């Protein structure tokens, strides 16, 4: 079993260097991956948690971490794909894959915040089709020596696109979400499945559904990565009203933490991302260290 940890770009840490320091720390502690999240505005549950404190850009954060780490996978959990032009995003992430020596994984989702879609001028009703098409465009650019693509949104022929990513045929895309649409997307297009906040029971059920759909589509599920992101309670209780309705792992009792992780392992999770639910840098450091030294070795 592999373990990742979130770098708190989304927790309002006002000294950005304090947030960035958790990337090298995660690597030194033996974590397999570091992850960042994606939102544009402090609205809804984010405002409830941060007020006006900073939420840093995910790709800028990963770019910095690519230079301060050498081993850990660099992931997004998740990038809201409809917010990003796929041609520009393919270029950025391929460059980042080169800079990092092939360590980029894109966890992607369709998005859920109406205000952000409105601010970008993107119809929220098109978010699913946009997500699917963005995946196709990026893979065409990453993998084809002379990429071509035609749709009502994007049109190009016989272009020369560089750099190609280190990882071939393309950067891995792990599909986030557990909705029916996300399940179909993971089965048909995902290199992995990476939902957040689902219980072990739901994970096992949805995993079986994805495997069945993928096999029906002629895909080899043995090549898929089964991942999940779960909030770890740095202090007892959820971080927001939204988090209260989602599955969480206790962080104040390491025996219970291990039992919760075992349940995800038994449900079929291979790469578990631990999202520490605090902006208190001292508590983040303490919890990262205790998990790495006392809990994670039980699952290696």
Residues of each region from the PLM?
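N-terminal beta1-alpha1-beta2 module of alpha/beta enzyme domains
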Residues: 1-68, 169-171, 275-290, 299
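Hydrophobic faces of well-ordered beta-strands that scaffold small-molecule active sites
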Residues: 3-7, 34-36, 74-76, 104-108, ...
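Active-site mouth loops of central-metabolism enzymes
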Residues: 5-16, 79-87, 169-178, 241-255
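Active-site beta-loop-alpha junctions enriched in small/polar residues
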Residues: 8-10, 39-41, 79-81, 109-113, ...
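Short, acidic/polar
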Residues: 14-26, 89-92, 175-185, 250-263
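An alpha-helical appendage that flanks or caps ligand/catalytic pockets
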Residues: 28, 32, 125-167, 196-300
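Internal, glycine-rich beta/alpha segment that forms the wall or movable "lid"
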Residues: 44-49, 76, 82-189, 204-223
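Glycine-enriched alpha-helix->loop->beta-strand junction motifs that scaffold or abut catalytic
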Residues: 68-71, 100, 187-193, 268-270
């Amino acid at each position: 079993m592999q373990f990742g940890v979130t770098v708190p770009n989304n927790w309002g840490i006002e000294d950005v260097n304090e947030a960035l320091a958790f990337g090298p720390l995660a690597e030194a502690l033996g974590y397999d991956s570091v992850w960042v999240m994606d939102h544009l505005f402090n609205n809804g549950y984010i405002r409830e948690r941060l007020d006006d404190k900073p939420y840093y850009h995910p790709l800028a954060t990963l770019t910095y971490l690519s230079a301060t780490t050498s081993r850990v996978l660099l992931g997004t959990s998740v990038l809201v794909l409809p917010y990003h032009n796929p041609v520009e995003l393919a270029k950025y992430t391929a460059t980042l894959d080169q800079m990092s020596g092939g360590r980029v994984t894109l966890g992607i989702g369709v998005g859920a915040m109406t205000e952000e879609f409105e601010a970008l001028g993107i119809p929220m009703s098109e978010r699913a089709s946009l997500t699917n098409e963005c995946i196709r465009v990026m893979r065409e650019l990453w993998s084809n020596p002379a990429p071509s693509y035609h749709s009502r949104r994007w049109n190009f022929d016989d272009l020369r696109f560089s750099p190609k990513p280190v990882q071939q045929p393309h950067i891995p895309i792990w599909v986030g979400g557990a909705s029916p649409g996300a399940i179909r997307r993971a089965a048909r297009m995902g290199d992995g499945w990476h939902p957040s906040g689902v219980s072990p029971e739901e994970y096992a059920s949805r995993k079986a559904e994805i495997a069945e759909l993928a096999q029906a589509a002629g895909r080899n599920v043995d090549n898929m990565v089964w991942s999940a992101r779960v909030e770890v309670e740095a202090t007892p209780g959820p971080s927001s009203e939204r988090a209260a309705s989602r599955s969480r792992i206790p962080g104040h009792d390491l025996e219970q933490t291990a039992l919760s992780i075992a349940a995800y392992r038994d449900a079929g999770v291979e790469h578990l991302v631990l999202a520490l639910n605090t902006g208190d840098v001292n508590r983040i450091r303490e919890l990262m260290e205790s998990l790495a030294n006392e809990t994670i070795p039980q699952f290696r």
